[in-house]
A protein has these predicted regions:
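Glycine-rich phosphate/nucleotide-binding loop
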Residues: 3-5, 63-66, 263-366
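Glycine-rich phosphate/diphosphate-binding loop of Rossmann-like nucleotide-binding domains
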Residues: 15-16, 21-37, 47, 163-256
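Buried hydrophobic positions in well-ordered alpha/beta secondary-structure cores of metabolic enzymes
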Residues: 26-29, 85, 141, 202, ...
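Buried hydrophobic packing segments
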Residues: 36, 40, 234, 334-342, ...
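N-terminal beta-loop-helix "entrance" segment that forms/cooperates
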Residues: 49-73
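Flexible, glycine/charged-enriched surface loops at secondary-structure junctions
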Residues: 49-55, 209-218, 243-254, 347-355, ...
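Active-site rim loops that border cofactor/substrate pockets in soluble metabolic enzymes
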Residues: 60-63, 226-275, 279, 283, ...
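N-terminal glycine-rich phosphate/adenylate-binding segment common to multiple enzyme folds
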Residues: 65-171, 184-185, 280-284
């Protein structure tokens, strides 16, 4: 009988047949989810000889939710994730500059999924622009709930922005808004609590995985109290809570300016292991790093609250509506995110089977169209790629 995943005394309780909600996603979401579900089920069945299985429960968000319920993110979806703790999702679209709230950001904020975790590693056989892509093996911890993603901004010419600018000028003595009559204004909240819980999770991850280097990436040379605060609070936390590890040398904490970090991950990526960043810097850096190992089409991601146990594992790329329904999509981002999910619930053996199947496919140049064009080889359709993986498992 299927049961819910529970959190007790800070630990996940995983039944042999957990119920895991999924969001199919927009665009190519249906294409890549149907493949991913079959691969996950096959790996779990093989790894545990049929003694474990996942009962999938569809929940709605995005276009499908809007068509069926009139809203893109129904309250029921949020409640089901809260109740079941762990979920997985395909890509969700948000119109640019239309005033619509990003569904991805909404999920993270509504569920307080404060850590965006993106492990970036190279798989042999995947096309990369770097000569030595195998040197890139970095796990990103991006703060997920603060920074400019809080969505506190006002449009140029609005009554609201006029009030904000007037307050800044009249009450706060601000004189360096260059064009106040035509400026939009945004606010960037960065808190001690938000920074420390993210950095704490990054350090705990590093120690759990026998990685001793944690790097704080920031723009504190310009934004002294927000980005600079992130850096300051990170060092404070390390000294307060991990003094023994620092003294023993099992943990080393350092920091780097964000623009220099983007240079160094190209010049010397081997110098970084686990990296903690504020929200916007993390957004830039995670996709830049993904490009070094094959792109976001093969980049997994998870949004996690380590305190409550809630987690959503997701495809990190867009909806690619131009190839939706054409059997051309690359499911690797979602599959690797599924591997993260399996590891999160302690089913590492199943995750290993999927990763091994992907590694074999890449080495043998059994790849989808996006990689095939770069490698100049015949491509596998999405459904053919599924068959390759199932045969390997």
């Amino acid at each position: 009988m299927a049961e819910k995943i529970l959190m007790r005394e800070g630990r996940l309780i995983i039944p042999d047949r957990p119920v895991i909600p999924y969001i199919e996603g927009d665009g190519i979401g249906r294409d890549i989810w149907s493949v991913s579900q079959k691969v996950i089920d096959a790996a779990v069945k093989k790894a545990y000889a049929g003694q474990r299985s996942i009962q999938w429960r569809e929940i709605l968000a995005g276009e499908k939710a809007y068509e069926l319920t009139g809203t893109s993110l129904p309250n029921e979806t949020l409640e089901i994730i809260r109740e079941h703790l762990v979920a997985i999702k395909g890509p969700l679209g948000t119109p640019i500059g239309k005033g619509h709230r990003s569904l991805n950001v909404a999920l993270r904020q509504e569920l307080d999924l404060y850590a965006c975790v993106r492990p970036i590693r190279y798989f042999k056989g995947v096309p990369s622009p770097l000569k030595e892509p195998e040197k890139t093996d970095i796990t990103i911890f991006r703060e997920n709930t603060e920074d400019i993603y809080a969505g506190i901004e006002w449009e140029a010419g609005s009554d609201e922005v006029a009030k904000v600018i007037s307050f800044l000028q009249d009450e706060m003595g601000v004189v360096n808004i260059r064009f106040p009559e035509s400026s939009s204004i945004g606010i960037k909240p960065i808190s001690e609590e938000g920074s420390k819980r993210l950095i704490r999770s990054a350090i705990e991850y590093a120690l759990e995985h026998q990685l001793k280097m944690l790097t704080l990436v920031h723009k504190g040379n310009i934004q002294k109290f927000t980005e600079g605060g992130f850096r300051k609070w990170g060092y404070e936390l390390a000294k307060e809570e991990f003094a023994t590890e620092l003294a023993e040398g099992t943990l080393v904490v350092n920091d780097i300016i964000a623009d220099n970090f983007l240079q160094q991950i190209l010049l010397a990526p081997e110098n970084f292991q686990v990296v903690a960043l504020t929200n916007l810097n993390g957004d830039y850096a995670s996709d830049a790093l993904a490009a070094q190992v094959g792109g976001i089409g093969i980049s997994p991601g998870a949004n996690i609250n380590y305190q409550t146990g809630h987690a959503i594992f997701e495809a990190t790329h867009g909806t690619a509506p131009d190839i939706a329904g054409k059997d051309l999509a690359n499911p690797c981002s979602l599959l690797l995110s599924a591997c993260m999910m399996l590891e999160y619930i302690g089913w590492k053996e199943a995750a290993v089977l999927i990763i091994q199947a992907l590694e074999d496919a890449f080495i043998n140049k059994n790849v989808t169209l996006d990689f095939a064009k770069i490698l100049d080889v015949a491509h596998q359709s999405t459904s053919q790629f599924l068959e390759v993986l199932i045969d390997s498992i």
